[in-house]
Amino acid sequence: MDSKKRSHSTGGEAENMESQESKAKRKPLQKHQFSKSNVVQKEEKDKTEGEEKGAEGLQEVVRQSRLRTAPSVLEFRFNKQRVRLISQDCHLQDQSQAFVYWMSRDQRVQDNWAFLYAQRLALKQKLPLHVCFCLAPCFLGATIRHYDFMLRGLEEVAEECEKLCIPFHLLLGLPKDVLPAFVQTHGIGGIVTDFSPLLHHTQWVKDVQDALPRQVPFVQVDAHNIVPCWVASDKQEYGARTIRHKIHDRLPHFLTEFPPVICHPYTSNVQAEPVDWNGCRAGLQVDRSVKEVSWAKPGTASGLTMLQSFIAERLPYFGSDRNNPNKDALSNLSPWFHFGQVSVQRAILEVQKHRSRYPDSVTNFVEEAVVRRELADNFCFYNKNYDKLEGAYDWAQTTLRLHAKDKRPHLYSLEQLESGKTHDPLWNAAQMQTVKEGKMHGFLRMYWAKKILEWTRSPEEALEFAIYLNDRFQLDGWDPNGYVGCMWSICGIHDQGWAEREIFGKIRYMNYAGCKRKFDVAEFERKISPAD
């Protein structure tokens, strides 16, 4: 799809790119630290101006950085290792009328490698580019909290696409039911989509592939991870210690600035129909009892505002206070990362500028936002039982089953857990924070899930309840990080065996007394009062 002539193979340029990169000399990278050559260095003046002007200043600095990188993606050396072929055919047909970027996980225009690759193909072939998003009226157990955040972000995407002369199409229905028909009706010559390791998304991709005409090339670009999932490792990694060096070794090749998505010069006769956003919300078949939250405003612009506030106000304390739920030291970027409204790569590019001032904070943020996040994608990509006890290591399955019949000190129903009606005021406060705010402090997520193991009838039920509650209330639900968080807490994924005890077996144990040694538990309990 990226050939100079439409009759040529779409894989040729990718093969050339890989060949050149395999011969390139890699510069050594110190552990937990980026070399100066791995990013386009920003002038100190830009950094200062961005800090002084706040979020608007950051957005302008970012825009200028893209323009300095390349006039467009056509003049940018695109790393084809980000791309993998889904279809069998890789030749573009002569009668092709346009390209499509099927947006799914990465719901933003700029800083989006999948969008950029789609525009690159369209510019090379001098064809129009369309963006399609497939909106199902219901999705698993998603609530209006999730849909509202997503739709308001997509509304911003649609507005930006219009300014760039790229039609945005909101297709109502499952991808297999609406996207192939759009392709056939409008003579689409090729499709680019983004990447998710989760089963529902991989099934959508397969269903679309099966329904597409065989002659339509279909490729996938990992626009979510800095190091593409299939490049970072070709197998399920045991833990952070085994994947960390693989990611850091590859960062010099992948942690680059982005070129801009530009105003597309080739217009289409197929215009996008105006989207009735209010009508879309009204037609959703979702639970509306889990309300929207006020602290997180959807969209890329608001996400960059949150990034700027993190850098200016909380990054200095992230290294020392990130595990204290009473301290405001976290990035709070998880919802924007989950919906792809802000690129993790963009966040790292901006945060790492401050390494000299806050080395510990930057190192720890990179560990969490890059290594741990990409480890979660790795687990879900290579382990299809990522949300089941069967996905755990053999030692963990064995120890949990040996202790499955151990007497529980308390047993709670799903309804009691959901409403925060347990004997544990810290657990109740953590649950109510999730219900009210759509988020839970990272340290408490571990304690919260481990107590569910202790208070339910079996490890299978504990995992089921934890995932249900996480996905129902967290703004970043249905995410690899959420599944891995529950699997780490309950099933020991990416962990080791510990001293054996009742119920937990060899799974790492946490308790109320341990939390009291970490932070002022009473202060947190006072801040988050249980529901009436």
Swiss-Prot record:
Cofactor(s) needed for function: FAD
Record carries keyword Nuclease: no
Biased composition (Basic residues): 24-34
UniProt catalytic activity: cyclobutadipyrimidine (in DNA) = 2 pyrimidine residues (in DNA)
UniProt: DNA binding residues: R322
Span list, region Disordered: 1-57
Pfam families: DNA_photolyase (PF00875)
Keyword Flavoprotein: yes
Top enzyme class: lyase
Stated role: Involved in repair of UV radiation-induced DNA damage. Catalyzes the light-dependent monomerization (300-600 nm) of cyclobutyl pyrimidine dimers (in cis-syn configuration), which are formed between adjacent bases on the same DNA strand upon exposure to ultraviolet radiation.
Xref: PANTHER family: DEOXYRIBODIPYRIMIDINE PHOTO-LYASE, DEOXYRIBODIPYRIMIDINE PHOTOLYASE
Name of this protein: Deoxyribodipyrimidine photo-lyase
Organism from which the protein derives: Potorous tridactylus
Gene name per UniProt: PHR
